[in-house]
């Protein structure tokens, strides 16, 4: 199902973004 693939890809993308934001936050602290 293409919807499920999109959802999992999207959550992976969000996880990556959150991880990068978290690293940036750590660097700035």
Swiss-Prot record:
Induction: Produced in the A cells of the islets of Langerhans in response to a drop in blood sugar concentration. Disulfide bonds: none annotated. Gene3D superfamilies: 6.10.250.590. One of its GO terms (cellular component) is extracellular space. Pfam families: Hormone_2. GO terms for biological process: adenylate cyclase-modulating G protein-coupled receptor signaling pathway; negative regulation of apoptotic process; positive regulation of insulin secretion involved in cellular response to glucose stimulus; protein kinase A signaling. Keywords: Hormone, Secreted. PROSITE patterns: GLUCAGON. One of its GO terms (molecular function) is hormone activity. Promotes hydrolysis of glycogen and lipids, and raises the blood sugar level. Belongs to the glucagon family. This is Glucagon. It is found in: Secreted. It comes from the Eukaryota. Its main location: secreted.
């Amino acid at each position: 199902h293409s919807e499920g693939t999109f959802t999992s890809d999207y959550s992976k993308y969000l996880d990556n973004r959150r991880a990068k934001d978290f690293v940036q936050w750590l660097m700035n602290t």
